[in-house]
């Protein structure tokens, strides 16, 4: 089995928001045991959904859950900069096009209990690939193997892929960048995703200016109190 290693800079970045995503993980657990296959999307690109997907998957794995992170943003994957391969890898598009077995695309990582399915090469027909029988076949095959499956999807405000993926998921989460996207666009994205039949689990407000709002700044909680003593 091919091994992927999360690069040090990304691991350090995830460490800074560890408590924030631990809180999100806890909220997901409280939302119901049935919510184990989750699609993560955003309105536009660059809002941090891939980073959020990775951080959430890390939090779940570090909490003791066997977790699979699937990079389904096959049009514009950024996870190749997060996980580096120790050898030649095949990814999701290889499997969906019938050029790889499921076992060929699930990669171990240097994080215990975390496995990853890379996106693979950019296909000429991303939406059509997701709509073929292989995607649902994959979900059926792995859903009882892992405690949680986190799927990073393309932005729903740009392409319909995220809604197609969400149709096979228990729920979805919207990631939005603070101060960038108007509320009506976020609401429209939520409605588009809900049309898939998937359950809306919440919004992750990303890239918050901490000089303006420090809510969620869990990393400093307790440190200020210790300094006062």
Swiss-Prot record:
SUPFAM superfamilies given in the database record: P-loop containing nucleoside triphosphate hydrolases
Keyword Transferase applies: yes
Pfam family, one: AAA_31
Name of this protein: Tyrosine-protein kinase CpsD
Gene3D superfamilies: P-loop containing nucleotide triphosphate hydrolases
Known catalytic reactions: L-tyrosyl-[protein] + ATP = O-phospho-L-tyrosyl-[protein] + ADP + H(+)
PANTHER family: FERRIC ENTEROBACTIN TRANSPORT PROTEIN FEPE, TYROSINE-PROTEIN KINASE
Keywords: ATP-binding, Capsule biogenesis/degradation, Exopolysaccharide synthesis, Kinase, Nucleotide-binding, Phosphoprotein, Transferase, Tyrosine-protein kinase
A GO CC term assigned to this protein in UniProt: plasma membrane
Lineage: Bacteria, Bacillati, Bacillota, Bacilli, Lactobacillales
Pathway: Capsule biogenesis; capsule polysaccharide biosynthesis
Known role: Involved in the regulation of capsular polysaccharide biosynthesis. Autophosphorylation of CpsD attenuates its activity and reduces the level of encapsulation. May be part of a complex that directs the coordinated polymerization and export to the cell surface of the capsular polysaccharide.
One GO BP annotation of this record: capsule polysaccharide biosynthetic process
Family of this protein: Belongs to the CpsD/CapB family.
UniProt cross-references to InterPro entries, sorted A to Z: AAA_dom, Bact_polysacc_biosynth/exp, P-loop_NTPase, Wzc-like_C
Post-translation changes: Autophosphorylated.
């Amino acid at each position: 089995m091919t091994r992927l290693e999360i690069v040090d800079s990304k691991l350090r970045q995830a460490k800074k928001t560890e408590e924030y995503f631990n809180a999100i993980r806890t909220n997901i657990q409280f939302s119901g045991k049935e919510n184990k296959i989750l699609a993560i999307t955003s309105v536009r690109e660059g809002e941090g959904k891939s980073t959020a997907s990775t951080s959430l998957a890390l939090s779940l794995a570090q909490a003791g859950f066997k977790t699979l992170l699937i990079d389904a943003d096959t049009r514009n994957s950024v996870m190749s900069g997060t996980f580096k391969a120790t050898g030649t890898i095949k990814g999701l598009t290889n499997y969906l096009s019938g050029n790889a077995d499921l076992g060929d695309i699930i990669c171990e990582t240097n994080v215990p209990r975390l496995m990853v399915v890379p996106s693979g090469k950019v296909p000429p027909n991303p939406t059509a690939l997701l709509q073929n029988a292989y995607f649902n076949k994959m979900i059926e095959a792995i859903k009882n193997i892992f405690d949680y499956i986190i799927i990073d999807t393309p932005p729903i405000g740009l392409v319909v892929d995220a809604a197609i993926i969400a149709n096979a998921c228990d729920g979805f989460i919207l990631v939005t960048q603070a101060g960038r996207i108007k509320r009506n666009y976020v609401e429209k994205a939520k409605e588009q995703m809900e049309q898939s039949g998937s359950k809306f689990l919440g919004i992750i407000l990303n890239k918050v200016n901490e000089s303006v709002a420090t809510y969620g700044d869990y990393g400093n909680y307790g440190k200020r109190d210790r300094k006062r003593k």
